[in-house]
Swiss-Prot record:
Residues 17-93 form a propeptide. Zn(2+) binds at residues 190, 194, 200. One of its GO terms (biological process) is proteolysis. This is Blastula protease 10. Could be involved in the differentiation of ectodermal lineages and subsequent patterning of the embryo. Keywords: Cleavage on pair of basic residues, Cytoplasm, Disulfide bond, EGF-like domain, Hydrolase, Metal-binding, Metalloprotease, Protease, Repeat, Secreted, Signal, Zinc, Zymogen. Residues 1-16 form the signal peptide. Residues 93-294 form the Peptidase M12A domain. Residues 295-329 form the EGF-like domain. It comes from Paracentrotus lividus. One of its GO terms (molecular function) is metalloendopeptidase activity.
Length: 597
């Protein structure tokens, strides 16, 4: 986490005090949660869905939260804090200190012979921090001790796993392990983040406003890795929580069953968890605040640099990645189309970026559809032209219709998928492309279906003297909720036109699909029926498919409808309502039930 720079007293679960530049501890104001911003936190680059689990989350023996080594003092304080949590004892008094920072913003380092093959990658990771902050990483020399007033330095070596101490923890060699499988740019940037004083982002006290921690999916004995701190013991410098921080856990860290251990409260942001591509703007802003990169006496009268920027020795603003302008006031714009959207309208159209033109390489788009509680969502693909692969491994559109936090079915090529129907009121569609070969993409329409399976008293009697069963309805004052089509099931229920008993809308095409248990049939009785009247039902009409392709050979409109019950041929029945551009009426209401024949 970028935030949590350790204190000199007890910190919730883990403590790591950082030393002030002068060597004196510097007390900071009491921390309060930063305000939540209306805009989304952004992370550089297109992120695939989901991110591969970061190597730094793989458990290292003796490490806390996978990749953080603790000093003896920190281990003792951590145990005391855990004991306090378990017993409910009042926390020991602690004051926020931003201590154990590296003095003068200079971090001496050595790269051991065991890591010589990784030296270019390690240097690139340090350059990334230098390019976006005022920190400087310098090869260790004999003069550093005299110039900086300490003997501390980072020592990169090829140890077991990926891990680092937090902040300036020793007055001597401080190791960072870049072991097997850890030699990736983002992983090394992450470990250096720990070394300069960052903790994991999901440890912040305000994390529950942004993420869900799913303890039921966490390995037994690993729950402490998901502990969070309190504002009385940590500081965020008022920088907003960032699910795209390079210091954030991925979605599946320490999973016991292959299911997520962390999800974002906004499902569209799940793909940002665990990114190891680059520092996020919020990472950069916090580092520059913590290390007081803008604290130059000669620039006291200069305008403040914004968005994590800081003044150089000439009092010009140095802007972090993603911003420019004299004061870093301008966000760098991109021509890449925005493709993270949330849909709540009852109907809509979703397309891949640039449709009907070709989508770009390296896209990662997330579309969330959410209806009212109790509703379902139907998604119909009308166009599909995506790079093909038997397992859709290259480019794909994925539909999550049951659990939006679990993998869904992937589609690619030119074959239109079947209609996708959600089991609840949410659906998540992601579209990803690799670095080569593109197509036109996809186009799909959706509709939110308000379920209208209001239960009615079972007062049906089947006559033994007639070939078609009839129904006698109970006289009730039930509330009827109409809809423009939908899927209906169960043993009995009710369907009605949109807005019933008020007039339905113009320009409708509503399809109602009623399906009961295999081996049974659907019986339908109209309670009310008033559509715009016309001799041949050319304007507004209702047609009925009794299943197995059998349709009634007439359209119904006006006030004319079958007086007897309609019975399906198979276990399903389909009703289609059509309205034109003018004149509407009350519509219809009908009850259905499953029967045995």
């Amino acid at each position: 986490m970028k935030l949590i720079l350790f204190l000199s007293g007890l910190v919730s679960l883990v403590l790591c005090t950082l030393a002030a530049p002068t060597g004196d501890q510097k007390e900071i104001h009491t921390e309060t949660p930063p305000p939540k911003k209306p805009s989304e936190t952004t992370t550089p680059g297109a992120l695939k869905t989901p991110q591969p689990e970061p190597k730094d989350e793989e458990p290292t023996p003796g490490a806390f939260q996978g990749d953080m080594m603790l000093t003896e003092d920190q281990q003792r304080e951590s145990k005391e804090a855990i004991d306090d949590e378990m017993t409910g004892r009042k926390k020991r008094k602690a004051t926020i200190y931003e201590s154990q920072r590296w003095p003068y913003k200079v971090i001496p380092y050595v790269i051991s012979p065991s890591s010589s093959g990784q030296s270019s990658l390690i240097r690139n990771a340090m350059d990334h921090w230098e390019q976006n902050t005022c920190l400087r990483f310098e090869p260790r020399t004999s003069s550093h001790s005299r110039q900086l007033g300490h003997n501390a330095y980072l020592s990169f070596f090829r140890g077991s796993g990926c891990w680092s101490y937090v902040g300036k923890a020793f007055n001597g060699e401080q190791q960072i392990s870049i072991g097997n499988g850890c030699a990736y740019f983002g992983t090394i940037v992450h470990e250096i983040g720990h070394a300069i004083g960052f903790h994991h982002e999901q440890s912040r006290p305000d994390r529950d406003d942004y993420i869900n921690v799913l303890y039921q999916n966490i390995q037994s004995g690993r729950q402490h890795n998901f502990a969070k701190y309190t504002w009385g013991r940590v500081t965020s410098r008022n920088v907003e929580y960032d699910v795209g921080s390079i210091m954030h856990y991925g979605g599946y860290g320490f999973s016991s069953n292959g299911r997520p251990t962390i999800t974002t409260r906004d499902p569209r942001l799940n793909s940002r968890l665990g990114q190891r591509i680059a520092l996020s703007p919020a990472d950069i802003e916090l580092a520059n605040l913590i290390y007081e990169c803008d604290d130059i006496e000669d620039c006291a009268g200069a305008n403040e640099c914004l968005n994590g920027g800081y003044h150089d020795t000439e009092c010009n603003c140095v802007c972090p990645s993603g911003y420019n302008g004299d004061l870093c006031e301008d966000a760098v714009t991109t021509t890449r189309p925005d493709c993270s959207e949330r849909f709540t309208e009852m109907t809509g159209v979703i397309t891949s970026p640039n449709w009907p033109g070709r989508y770009e390489d390296n896209m990662a788009c997330v579309y969330q559809i959410e209806g009212p509680p109790g509703s379902t969502i139907e998604l119909t693909f009308t166009e599909m032209n995506i790079e093909n692969h038997a397992a859709c491994r290259y480019d794909a559109v994925e539909v999550r219709k049951d659990d939006i936090n679990s993998d869904g079915e992937k589609f690619c090529g030119n074959t239109l998928p079947a209609v996708q129907i959600s089991s609840g009121n949410q659906m998540l569609i992601s579209f990803t492309s690799d670095p080569s070969i593109t197509g036109r993409g996809f186009r799909a329409t959706y509709r939110i279906v308000i379920l209208t399976t209001t239960q009615i008293p079972d007062t049906t009697t089947i006559s033994t003297t007639t070939p078609v069963p009839t129904t006698t309805q109970a006289t009730t004052d039930e509330t009827v909720v109409g809809s423009c089509g939908g899927s209906f099931g169960g043993t009995q229920g009710r369907v009605a036109t949109p807005n019933y008993p008020n007039n339905y809308d113009n320009d409708l095409e509503c399809v109602y699909v009623i399906e009961v248990e295999i081996g049974r049939r659907v019986e339908l009785d109209f309670i009310d029926f008033v559509l715009e009247d016309e001799t041949n039902c050319r304007w507004d009409s209702l047609s009925i498919n009794l299943g197995d392709g059998i349709k009634i050979d007439m359209k119904m409109c006006g006030r004319e409808y079958p007086a007897a019950s309609l019975v399906s041929i198979g276990n399903n029945m389909e009703l289609t309502l059509i309205s034109d551009r003018s004149v509407t009426d009350r519509g219809f209401m009908a009850d259905y039930r499953a029967i045995d024949l």
